[in-house]
């Protein structure tokens, strides 16, 4: 049984509240879970504690092999329970292949025009 530590949505419409739960990976988002190990209230102001974690139970489930989702891993990293690897994408923000070809073609056309102007 693959275990996940993930968010389960509660609250009402436009007022989300999430429980941090340990659940089987196959169960639905708000469905059956094994244990509730924390809560996250994104509606609280930033200066108030939004995340509440039961750290010893989370550590127990991590030792049992439960995998946290990306959002929960951010919370665990902030609490110092599990390290979140830094993401590295050196190509982010670079133009795509076709855009690079267009830029190269425009640069070549500008150089050709400059060379033609110099020889004339």
From Swiss-Prot:
Q: Which Pfam families match?
A: Ribosomal_S16
Which terms are listed as keywords in the entry? Ribonucleoprotein, Ribosomal protein
Record-level Gene Ontology MF annotations: structural constituent of ribosome
InterPro entries in the cross-refs: Ribosomal_bS16, Ribosomal_bS16_dom_sf
Give the GO cellular component terms, alphabetically: cytoplasm; small ribosomal subunit
Positions of the UniProt region annotated as Disordered: 80-120
Q: For this chain's UniProt record, which GO biological process terms are given?
A: translation
KW Transmembrane (keyword) present = no
Q: Where is the composition biased (Basic residues)?
A: 81-90
Gene3D superfamilies, A to Z: 3.30.1320.10
Instruction: Please note every region of biased composition (Basic and acidic residues).
Output: 91-101, 109-120
What family does the entry list? Belongs to the bacterial ribosomal protein bS16 family.
Designated name of the protein: Small ribosomal subunit protein bS16
- What gene, per UniProt, encodes this protein? rpsP
């Amino acid at each position: 049984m693959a275990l996940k530590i993930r968010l389960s949505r509660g609250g009402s419409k436009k007022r989300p509240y999430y429980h941090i739960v340990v659940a089987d990976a196959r169960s639905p988002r708000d469905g059956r879970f094994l244990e509730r190990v924390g809560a996250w209230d994104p509606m609280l102001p930033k200066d108030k504690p939004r995340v509440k974690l039961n750290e010893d139970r989370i550590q127990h489930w991590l030792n049992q092999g439960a995998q946290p989702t990306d959002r929960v891993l951010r919370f665990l990293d902030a609490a110092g329970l599990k390290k979140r690897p830094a993401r590295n994408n050196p190509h982010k923000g670079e133009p795509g292949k076709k855009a690079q070809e267009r830029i190269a073609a425009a640069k070549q056309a500008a150089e050709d025009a400059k060379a033609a102007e110099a020889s004339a």
